[in-house]
């Protein structure tokens, strides 16, 4: 057998089937774009369903691929077994009604045993077939020459997922030798059994029946072939290593983790699990982010968040307590660059996403673990071995612990999690969100009289701000009326209207309806269930009557402000993509006459430099005076043009395309300027985060931008006055004052250090001796944890050999720091364990290394008790 790299095996497979007349299908994105039934692409055949179900006829009925895939249904096994993965590659060859069993079997054998290809020893291969698949049995025995004793009939060799195509399958197994199993009395020691010796390397599915709704099977008119070979498993056999993780697909990642952690792979089962989890999960996350997924609390994003946080949890077991996964992205990119160059091309972006997610979790991790520790203690005190759904939800909602992560921590403590209770809390949260989203004024969800009105109403407001129209219906309090009088609030439907109804983030127009008989002040416009514009207003004078002819007039000054802000929003959207990356997508917007608000997906903070660049681009496009073209197009044509569509929006067959020169193109039903020069000026007023992975920009245009700049200048002039400086010298004056302040702070710190040394010297006389070891536990004055650690270090230096645990109370919270010298560690004492125990008494948590550790708590009144408990712990060890 040849020695081959994983890249060589992958390419060899594709080359072999290309020689056999197969079209090589590119590896599709992990994020399915045309299959709503899938969260991820999870197999080689998943991307070819369109061919197998007849929706699309392939140019070539013979297809092969190497398809990246994600499965997370048994994530808890990843890292604990030799071959479970969340990300893997499937090599497959497929026939859509072309060749069948004979060719599939012959070619599989040729690829595996020919010296030109893999070159396996044929005597080490066995096969399994379905008991009733005589055709496959005969082909293996007579055509290929496999001895009967190595052809095993198994009932399980039938591929069936319910209604639809199904059929028998045959699997090929490689004998890895007696070192992986030699007990002849083991009932599972055979190809197809649960053992490590006979490893399945290829599965050939013969799709020849249709599974009918009544449970019967009938032959398919066109028979198909669907095969799958796991690259990771195949490479483990070729490279003669015990697990998939020992192949060249994983080992460079594991070596990098060794460097980061200072630990070694292959020493203990617990450590190896951590190495494997990290190596597997970074591959999954890197590829998923490369294909457009981002961490979040829903769907695919939740999977990524769960994987990253699971990796962080295992990293702690090999002493990695900082964000580090992002450092592994270049390693993954280098391993996979030959076939998947996209990962290397997006390496910086992927690392940025992962680093941001890691940093967010680390901010809450220790506090969350402290809460979990309290919860576990509370339940044990009650005699319970289950964590309540309410507590699990709190850890999820407040500290970012995926429920599965809490389950793993609970399992370590021999406890369970109330899943049903957690789901109930989640449903309560969803209900709260639904209630918050409900717009009581929304016409779209109302039935009654409005729902029964079918008469047509035409919107002419794209071209005209006035129109002569008939009042076709009047409503008050949800009921149809024939007239409304002065002072009444009324809803009016017109046969023709220039008023824009609130939608797509753009607010409704305001204005008037006038005639000789009546004047109505229009305050709001919404869409009725059947699409008509419903004008809500107050009768200022006269009487409104059904059938009356009125002049409908939009307040032009308000509309002008709205269109400036709406077109500016489109420019902003594209500028965000240009500066931050193509992952940016609109997550919400509000456009009114005074300002615009734009919510967008982004994984980290936007820097001042990036904001400045975004603002500059938008203004440059405004000053270029670009024409804005608006056309109606078939949706397919619009998408081919590259028009941005909003995720979750429903579009008809014909869509409205708004194009700003060759810079921006979006599907949009709103109102816009004719030329960007009309906007005048664009100024970002604020940028902030509004949720995980979502940012918000508020901006102003035209006169509003001028006023914003004037306000900022006024603030600058006021600051200059307070600083007794001119405006140009304000930065220098601030820098000078900061330098003076730092000097004062340095003097204060020097005084504090001297005081600490003095206090440390004074408490040396309180050292006790337990079992021949110096022990010092004391409550001290320390302004923060850094100050406390410095005191511990000073005392360690003075004592030379000792156990030191100091506690301090600051702003109602407890800080605890511990230090243990090396010689005492060898006697069995561990700073991390001592500090954890003390912190738990104070209602907190923490830990650390054997020589140095720190923790926090919430109950300062229990600090003395906690410090006393440390002495008891030392006695129990010594």
From Swiss-Prot:
Keyword terms, alphabetized: Aminoacyl-tRNA synthetase, ATP-binding, Cytoplasm, Ligase, Metal-binding, Nucleotide-binding, Protein biosynthesis, RNA-binding, tRNA-binding, Zinc
Cofactor remark: Binds 1 zinc ion per subunit.
Residues reported in the UniProt entry to bind Zn(2+): 566, 570, 668, 672
One Pfam match: tRNA-synt_2c
Annotated GO CC locations: cytosol
Segments for region (Disordered): 846-866
Top-rank lineage group of the source organism: Bacteria
GO molecular-function terms, A-Z: alanine-tRNA ligase activity; aminoacyl-tRNA deacylase activity; ATP binding; catalytic activity, acting on a protein; transferase activity; tRNA binding; zinc ion binding
Biological processes annotated in GO: alanyl-tRNA aminoacylation
UniProt-listed CDD domains: AlaRS_core
InterPro entries, sorted: aa-tRNA-synth_II/BPL/LPL, Ala-tRNA-lgiase_IIc, Ala-tRNA-ligase_IIc_anticod-bd, Ala-tRNA-synth_IIc_core, Ala-tRNA-synth_IIc_N, Ala-tRNA_ligase, Ala_tRNA_ligase_euk/bac, DHHA1_dom
Catalytic activity annotation: tRNA(Ala) + L-alanine + ATP = L-alanyl-tRNA(Ala) + AMP + diphosphate
Subcellular location: Cytoplasm
Biological function: Catalyzes the attachment of alanine to tRNA(Ala) in a two-step reaction: alanine is first activated by ATP to form Ala-AMP and then transferred to the acceptor end of tRNA(Ala). Also edits incorrectly charged Ser-tRNA(Ala) and Gly-tRNA(Ala) via its editing domain.
Domain-level remarks: Consists of three domains; the N-terminal catalytic domain, the editing domain and the C-terminal C-Ala domain. The editing domain removes incorrectly charged amino acids, while the C-Ala domain, along with tRNA(Ala), serves as a bridge to cooperatively bring together the editing and aminoacylation centers thus stimulating deacylation of misacylated tRNAs.
Protein family per UniProt: Belongs to the class-II aminoacyl-tRNA synthetase family.
Protein name: Alanine--tRNA ligase
């Amino acid at each position: 057998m040849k020695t081959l790299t994983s890249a060589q095996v992958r390419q060899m497979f594709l080359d072999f089937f290309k020689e056999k007349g197969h079209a090589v299908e590119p590896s599709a994105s992990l994020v399915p774009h045309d299959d709503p039934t899938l969260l991820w692409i999870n197999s080689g055949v998943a991307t070819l369903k369109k061919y197998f179900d007849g929706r699309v006829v392939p140019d070539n009925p013979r297809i092969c691929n190497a398809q990246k895939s994600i499965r997370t249904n048994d994530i808890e096994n990843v890292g604990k077994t030799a071959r479970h993965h969340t990300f893997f590659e499937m090599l497959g060859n497929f026939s859509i009604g072309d060749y069948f069993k004979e060719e599939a079997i012959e070619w599989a054998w040729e690829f595996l045993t020919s010296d030109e290809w893999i070159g396996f020893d044929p005597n080490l291969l066995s096969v399994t077939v379905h008991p009733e698949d005589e055709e496959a049995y005969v082909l293996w025995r007579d055509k290929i020459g496999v001895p009967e004793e190595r052809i095993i009939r198994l009932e399980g060799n039938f591929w069936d997922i319910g209604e639809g195509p199904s059929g028998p399958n045959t699997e090929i197994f490689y004998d890895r030798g007696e070192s992986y199993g030699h007990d002849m009395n083991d009932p599972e020691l055979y190809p197809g059994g649960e053992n490590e010796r006979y490893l399945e390397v290829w599965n050939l599915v013969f799709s020849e029946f249709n599974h009918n709704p009544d449970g019967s099977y009938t032959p398919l008119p066109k028979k198909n072939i669907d095969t799958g070979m796991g690259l990771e498993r195949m490479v483990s056999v070729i490279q003669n290593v015990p697990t998939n993780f020992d192949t060249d697909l994983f080992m460079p990642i594991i070596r990098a983790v060794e460097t980061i952690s200072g630990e070694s792979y292959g020493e203990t089962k617990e450590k190896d699990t951590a190495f494997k989890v990290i190596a597997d999960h970074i591959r999954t996350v890197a590829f998923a982010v490369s294909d457009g997924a981002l961490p979040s609390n829903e769907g695919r994003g939740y999977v990524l968040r769960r994987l990253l946080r699971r990796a962080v949890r295992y990293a702690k077991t090999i002493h990695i307590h900082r964000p580090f996964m992002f450092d592994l992205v270049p390693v993954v990119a280098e391993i996979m660059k030959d076939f998947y160059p996209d990962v290397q091309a997006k390496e910086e972006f992927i690392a940025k996403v992962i680093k941001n997610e890691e940093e967010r979790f680390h901010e809450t991790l220790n506090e969350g673990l402290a809460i979990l520790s309290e919860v576990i203690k509370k339940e044990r005190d009650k005699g319970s071995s289950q964590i309540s759904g309410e507590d699990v939800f709190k850890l999820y909602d407040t500290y970012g612990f995926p429920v599965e992560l809490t389950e793993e921590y609970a399992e370590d403590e021999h406890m369970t999690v109330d899943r049903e209770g957690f789901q109930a809390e989640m449903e309560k949260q969803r209900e709260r969100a639904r209630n918050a989203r409900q717009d009581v004024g929304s016409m779209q969800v109302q039935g009654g009289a409005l729902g029964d009105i079918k008469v047509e109403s035409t919107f002419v407001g794209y071209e005209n701000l006035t129109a002569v129209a008939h009042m076709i219906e009047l409503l008050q309090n949800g009921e149809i009326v024939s007239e409304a009088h002065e002072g009444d609030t009324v809803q009016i439907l017109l046969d023709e209207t220039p008023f824009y109804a609130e939608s797509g983030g753009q607010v409704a127009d305001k204005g008037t309806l006038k005639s000789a008989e009546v004047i109505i002040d229009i305050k709001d416009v919404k869409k009725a269930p059947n699409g008509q514009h419903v004008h809500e207003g107050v009768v200022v004078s006269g009487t409104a009557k059904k059938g009356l002819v009125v002049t409908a007039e939009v307040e032009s000054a308000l509309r002008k402000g709205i269109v400036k802000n709406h077109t500016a929003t489109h420019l902003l959207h594209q500028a965000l993509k240009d500066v931050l990356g193509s992952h940016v997508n609109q997550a919400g917007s509000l456009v009114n006459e005074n300002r615009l608000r734009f919510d967008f997906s982004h994984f980290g903070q936007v820097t001042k430099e990036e904001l400045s660049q975004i603002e500059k681009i938008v203004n440059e496009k405004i000053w270029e005076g670009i024409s804005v073209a608006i056309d109606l197009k078939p949706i397919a044509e619009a998408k081919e043009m590259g028009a941005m569509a909003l995720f979750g929006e429903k579009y008809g067959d014909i869509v409205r395309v708004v194009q700003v020169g060759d810079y921006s193109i979006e599907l949009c039903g709103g109102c816009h300027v004719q030329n960007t020069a009309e906007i005048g000026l664009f100024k970002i007023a604020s940028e902030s985060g509004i949720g995980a992975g979502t940012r918000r920009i508020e901006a102003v245009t035209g006169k509003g931008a001028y006023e914003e700049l004037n306000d900022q200048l006024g603030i600058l002039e006021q600051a200059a006055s307070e600083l007794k400086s001119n405006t140009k010298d304000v930065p220098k004056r601030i820098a000078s004052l900061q330098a003076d302040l730092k000097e004062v702070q340095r003097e204060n710190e020097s005084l504090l250090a001297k005081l600490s040394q003095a206090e440390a010297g004074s408490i040396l006389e309180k050292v006790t001796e337990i079992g021949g070891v110096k022990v010092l536990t004391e409550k001290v004055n320390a302004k923060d944890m850094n100050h406390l650690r410095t005191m511990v270090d000073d005392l360690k230096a003075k004592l030379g050999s000792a156990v030191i645990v100091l506690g301090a109370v600051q702003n109602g919270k407890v800080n605890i720091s511990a230090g243990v010298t090396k010689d005492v560690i060898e006697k069995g004492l561990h700073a991390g364990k001592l500090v954890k125990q003390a912190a738990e008494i104070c209602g907190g948590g923490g830990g650390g290394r054997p020589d140095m550790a720190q923790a926090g708590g919430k109950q300062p009144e229990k600090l003395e008790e906690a410090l006393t408990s440390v002495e008891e712990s030392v006695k129990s060890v010594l």
